[in-house]
């Protein structure tokens, strides 16, 4: 194992104490009992938050000690980061060892390359094939990757939507209760849900990497992480939840990969994006509370199926890693990791109904102006909502649209922001709507 932090400690405890992988315990009910013989760390003297069985496991500081050990069959990478982790993963595969990792950044950017390397190694030495497991890289406590690899082989997936970040789901839940963004961010940091630098979570970057992986598994097409339109939750306000409530909705940060329909020349194109989204309260995705995760898959055979569970944490993530280890050890890993339908068109100017909140200084003709600007932008307005105005110098109104392209909504918001009555750039987000 490379790395011995929170998740690595959980992996060690599950394997050595619960699966009987230590020399003093041998009670596993599995066909194969794994043993962690070496753990590579930067500082061997550092105190760990798990008890090491020194009779079974050796702490080392040089990864070559693992790579050169012919008795090691599987390398578990839980060190984090990208550069060192990538080098370690590639070197492990080249040395004939299977690899299990939880590294979403590595997988999101390099999955095609890793699978090509696995195939190359196996072609060179077919008598001892290597495997690659990465279940824990997305929604740590939900076996969503294995589900996509093996549960939809005879199906056609039309859409994957996921609440894949527990931190932002917790924060949005508190904002729905009336807590301001700044206060709930501090609370999330105090509870350990959010990092001191919360950018990856609140700006949607974490979800962006995860939906890139799920899109590859569901549709067989690689999507550059940087090309994915991504909006976080930093512009969401308590007032947005008030409007959402009046519409029978809540707000969730969702990663989406969808085959677009009703899109003219781009009909059938794949759109992948991350954004806060208005979700009806009776929708499957509205069920995720606290730091929980939900993934909803819409397919031809099953319709909509949802998968729910903890998205992160020591033992949920470690459990997914151990599940991969056991699949590798028992030779039950899927041989084809994703559908080979790589010719699908990518078009991230996605189509949706949209919610647009406009902050303005009250005056005559504002609704008419917004309607005219919408017409110029090719946007059809579905409804206009307004909470009672208590301050005419700083009021809000909400426009919901019929289905239109992201580029059209951005153009409309740019035009509105230039008007004298606009106090700020409009806040917009897609909606899950039946119309």
Indicate where each model-derived feature is located.
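Rossmann-like NAD(P)H-binding beta-loop-alpha module
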Residues: 72, 122, 127, 133-206, ...
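Substrate-binding/catalytic subdomain of NAD(P)-dependent oxidoreductase enzymes
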Residues: 174-175, 183-287, 292-294
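NAD(P)-binding Rossmann-fold cofactor-contacting core
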Residues: 17-52
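Rossmann-fold NAD(P)-binding glycine/threonine-rich loop
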Residues: 79, 84-95, 104-149
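N-terminal Rossmann-fold NAD(P) dinucleotide-binding loop
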Residues: 8-9
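Rossmann-like NAD(P)-binding element
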Residues: 57-58, 63-89, 97-102
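Catalytic, metal-anchored helix/loop core of enzyme active sites in primary metabolism
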Residues: 58, 159-161, 169-172, 187, ...
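A conserved regulatory-domain signal marking ACT and ACT-like small-molecule sensing domains
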Residues: 320, 325-435
């Amino acid at each position: 194992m490379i790395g011995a932090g929170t998740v690595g400690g959980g992996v060690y405890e599950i394997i050595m104490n619960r699966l009987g992988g230590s020399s003093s315990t041998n009670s596993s009910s599995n066909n194969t009992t794994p043993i962690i013989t070496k753990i590579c760390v930067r500082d061997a003297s550092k105190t760990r938050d798990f008890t090491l069985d020194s009779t079974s496991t050796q702490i080392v500081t040089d990864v070559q000690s693992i790579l050169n050990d012919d008795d090691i069959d599987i390398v578990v990478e839980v060190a984090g980061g990208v550069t060192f982790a990538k080098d370690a993963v590639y070197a492990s595969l080249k040395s004939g060892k299977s690899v299990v990792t939880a590294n979403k950044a590595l997988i999101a950017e390099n999955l095609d390359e890793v699978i090509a390397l696995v195939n190359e190694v196996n072609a060179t030495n077919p008598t001892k094939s290597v495997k690659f497991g990465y279940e824990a890289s997305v929604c740590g406590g939900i076996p969503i990757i294995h589900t996509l690899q093996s549960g939809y082989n005879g199906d056609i997936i039309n859409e994957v939507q996921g609440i894949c970040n527990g931190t932002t789901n917790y924060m949005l839940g508190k904002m729905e209760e009336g807590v301001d963004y700044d206060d709930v961010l501090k609370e999330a940091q105090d509870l350990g849900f959010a990092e001191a630098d919360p950018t990856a979570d609140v700006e949607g970057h974490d979800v962006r990497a995860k939906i890139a992986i799920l899109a590859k598994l569901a549709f067989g097409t690689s999507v550059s992480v940087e090309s994915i339109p991504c909006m976080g939750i930093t512009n969401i306000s308590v007032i947005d939840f008030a409007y959402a409530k009046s519409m029978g909705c809540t707000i969730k940060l969702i990663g989406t990969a969808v085959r677009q329909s009703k899109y003219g020349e781009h009909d059938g194109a794949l759109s992948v994006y991350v954004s806060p989204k208005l979700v009806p309260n009776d929708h499957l995705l509205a069920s995720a509370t606290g730091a929980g995760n939900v993934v909803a898959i819409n397919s031809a055979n099953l319709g909509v199926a949802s998968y729910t569970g903890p998205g992160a944490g020591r033992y949920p993530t470690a459990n997914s890693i151990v599940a991969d280890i056991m699949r590798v050890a028992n030779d039950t890993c899927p041989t084809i990791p994703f559908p080979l339908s790589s010719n699908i068109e990518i078009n991230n100017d996605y189509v949706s109904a949209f919610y647009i909140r406009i902050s303005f200084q009250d005056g005559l003709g504002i609704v008419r102006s917004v309607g005219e600007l919408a017409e110029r932008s090719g946007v059809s307005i579905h409804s206009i909502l307004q909470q009672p105005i208590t301050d005419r110098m700083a009021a809000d109104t909400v426009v919901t649209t019929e289905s239109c392209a992201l580029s059209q909504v951005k153009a409309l918001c740019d035009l509105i922001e230039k008007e004298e009555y606009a106090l700020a750039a409009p806040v917009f987000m897609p909606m899950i709507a039946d119309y």
